[in-house]
């Protein structure tokens, strides 16, 4: 595995010193890295009374390796909180990003804790794909002396709830690992479950381990050690929406908005590849409709996180109304004894299908009942922010942040419905209106550190967003590396997002190649994966020249089809079978040369 490029501008080492340090630590285990960290900290603080961490005596249990496998940041936050808990308990812990973990050393781990989310159709988060593939391959080693625990985050509105955590848990046990604790599967409202689990992990590890000397953690890839800001998911910045521009044509079936948000003098910083978290307000009209369907008024007092609020206010600001789940359907059916819904109870597939096709308000319309206000609140999930890939680079836009928003709109039996965050941004926040935002850093979707490295960008639809940021950054840096964009959408005349900008980059020689797939402009549908196969020989040449490959967009179909096409290109032009091509692509992923931001 190659070492991720450091933020050299922030380091007090020159390149030669940094290279020597990296060479000296390449083959160290997490326990050895933790000891080295503590040793140097002690050297620098001889008068503070600090005690350098010493290796565990023979026969004693070594430190804990804590792997964070995060897609939207929640798993990372849980892992960081557990790290702090373990350090407070005087236990030696190494926190490592799954993308940085040297997974071939897993058989030497004594204590292993994994905190993971799930994406797409039950796949692991991007940073954990290589580890997942290794564990499920023939190369996986027996875990003869490894004790482990898994905390899994998911969303019950998806069919493959917490599947990644289930996979890690079952495979580690199958390979011979000993469970420290039973796996915990947490829904969107994960905080209470995580807090309880963290306490149990600390207790069980304290009971197994001798008390260690005060220790230092090695947080490889833990972005909170690099990115600091007073504005977070729980304490967002109140910014100003300055531009809301429709960038699809009048006759397009899609409504895509270019949104610009003014960060003012907040000092909020981001990098190309990061996401913008947006807290939104539910549509007051939707709240009114739901309240009236339940024969309520909206002024009924309800308790939310220990505070008393009017029902309508609670529904607007604190609860998810636009995404139904199987659990909500089942609980509503049981609570109301609905004759139409009770037959679904116990049938997971039918519950999932009903939830996916019937919004909460229409479930209530089709199966009316009378609930008191607090019972309604008890059915619902807390509102969560939506994440949008950032479509700008601060090297060009400075104190602004841009996003590309596909507005979700559809009808249910003639009644207009819309996505919560997208309709909020597109239609309910006026220009110069307030919007609460934060940056979700993504160090697993970064431009190459070397500006001469070629870049291949694959982003159909709104997946184009981060590549606009990439090109702004490459242009501002004067990067000499070649750039190749694959983009697709239904129609050239209606759906060519940011067309003028791409044409300008081509004219200026910044964008060296652009391949476009218009799926509805001819009888035969053409997608970006077809363009990849069409350009297979040249694509393979770029890969051999060290190109980094980036994919952004839909995880369910597009990302799967694109990866299949890449494997076929690698197999054909690299003279490999598909299994070898898969190993090759996995190695590119480990080297950070194949990165995806899919959702």
From Swiss-Prot:
Listed GO MF terms: flavin adenine dinucleotide binding; FMN binding; sulfite reductase (NADPH) activity
Name by which UniProt lists this protein: Sulfite reductase [NADPH] flavoprotein alpha-component
Gene name of this polypeptide: cysJ
Organism of derivation: Salmonella paratyphi A (strain ATCC 9150 / SARB42)
Domain Flavodoxin-like: 64-202
Reactions this protein catalyses: hydrogen sulfide + 3 NADP(+) + 3 H2O = sulfite + 3 NADPH + 4 H(+)
Entries under SUPFAM superfamilies matching the protein: Ferredoxin reductase-like, C-terminal NADP-linked domain, Flavoproteins, Riboflavin synthase domain-like
Chain positions recorded as FAD binding sites: 322, 356, 386-389, 404-406, 410, 419-422, 599
InterPro entries: CysJ, CysJ-like_FAD-binding, CysJ_Proteobact, FAD-bd_FR_type, Flavdoxin-like, Flavodoxin/NO_synth, Flavoprot_Pyr_Nucl_cyt_Rdtase, Flavoprotein-like_sf
GO biological-process terms attached to the record: cysteine biosynthetic process; hydrogen sulfide biosynthetic process; sulfate assimilation
């Amino acid at each position: 595995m190659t070492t991720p490029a450091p933020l050299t501008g922030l380091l007090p080492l020159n390149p030669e010193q940094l290279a020597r340090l990296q060479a000296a630590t390449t083959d160290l285990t997490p326990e050895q890295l933790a000891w080295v960290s503590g040793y140097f900290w002690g050297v620098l603080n001889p008068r503070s009374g600090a005690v350098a961490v010493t290796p565990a005596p023979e026969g004693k249990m070594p430190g804990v390796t804590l792997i964070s496998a995060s897609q939207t940041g929640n798993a990372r936050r849980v892992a960081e909180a557990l790290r702090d808990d373990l350090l407070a308990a005087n236990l030696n812990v190494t926190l490592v990003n799954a993308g940085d973990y040297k997974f071939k050393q897993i058989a030497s781990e004594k204590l292993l804790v994994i905190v993971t989310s799930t994406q797409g159709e039950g796949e692991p988060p991007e940073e954990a794909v290589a580890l997942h593939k290794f564990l499920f391959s023939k190369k996986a080693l027996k875990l003869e002396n490894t004790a482990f625990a898994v905390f899994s985050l998911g969303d019950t509105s998806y069919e493959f709830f917490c599947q990644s955590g289930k996979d890690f848990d079952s495979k580690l046990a199958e390979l011979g690992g000993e469970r420290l604790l039973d796996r915990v599967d947490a829904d969107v409202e994960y905080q209470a479950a995580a807090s309880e689990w963290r306490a149990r992990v600390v207790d069980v590890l304290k009971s197994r381990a001798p008390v260690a000397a005060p220790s230092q953690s090695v947080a490889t890839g833990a972005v909170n050690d690099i990115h600091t800001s007073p504005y977070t998911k729980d304490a967002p910045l109140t910014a100003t929406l300055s531009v809301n521009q429709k960038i699809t044509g009048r006759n397009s079936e899609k409504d895509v908005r270019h949104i610009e948000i003014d960060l003012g003098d907040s000092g909020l910083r981001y990098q190309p590849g990061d996401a913008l978290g947006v807290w939104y307000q539910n549509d007051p009209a939707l709240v009114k409709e739901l309240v009236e369907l339940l024969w309520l008024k909206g002024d009924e007092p309800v308790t939310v996180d220990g505070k008393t609020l009017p029902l309508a206010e609670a529904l607007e600001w604190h609860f998810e109304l636009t995404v139904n789940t199987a659990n909500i359907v089942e609980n509503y059916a049981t609570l109301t004894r609905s004759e139409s819904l009770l037959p679904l109870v116990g049938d997971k597939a039918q519950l999932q299908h009903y939830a996916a096709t019937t919004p909460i308000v229409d479930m209530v319309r089709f199966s009316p009942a009378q609930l008191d206000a607090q019972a309604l609140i008890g059915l619902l999930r807390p509102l969560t922010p939506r994440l949008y890939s950032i479509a700008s680079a601060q090297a060009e836009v400075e104190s602004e942040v841009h996003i590309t928003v596909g507005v979700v709109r559809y009808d249910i039996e003639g009644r207009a419905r819309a996505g919560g965050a997208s309709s909020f941004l597109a239609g309910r926040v006026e220009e110069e209106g307030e919007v609460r935002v934060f940056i979700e850093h993504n160090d697993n979707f970064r431009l190459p550190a070397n500006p001469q490295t070629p870049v291949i960008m694959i982003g159909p639809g709104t997946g184009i967003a981060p590549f606009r940021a990439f090109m702004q950054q490459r242009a501002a840096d004067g990067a000499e590396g070649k750039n190749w964009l694959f983009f697709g959408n239904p129609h050239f005349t209606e759906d060519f997002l940011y067309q003028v900008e791409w044409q300008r980059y081509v004219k200026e020689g910044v964008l060296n190649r652009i391949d476009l797939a218009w799926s509805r402009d001819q009888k035969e549908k053409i997608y970006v994966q077809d363009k990849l196969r069409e350009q297979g020989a040249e694509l393979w040449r770029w890969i051999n020249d060290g190109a980094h490959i980036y994919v952004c967009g839909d995880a369910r179909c597009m990302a799967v089809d694109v990866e299949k096409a890449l494997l076929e290109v690698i197999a054909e032009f690299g003279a490999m079978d598909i299994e070898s091509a898969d190993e090759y692509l996995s190695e590119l992923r480990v080297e950070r040369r194949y990165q995806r931001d899919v959702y």
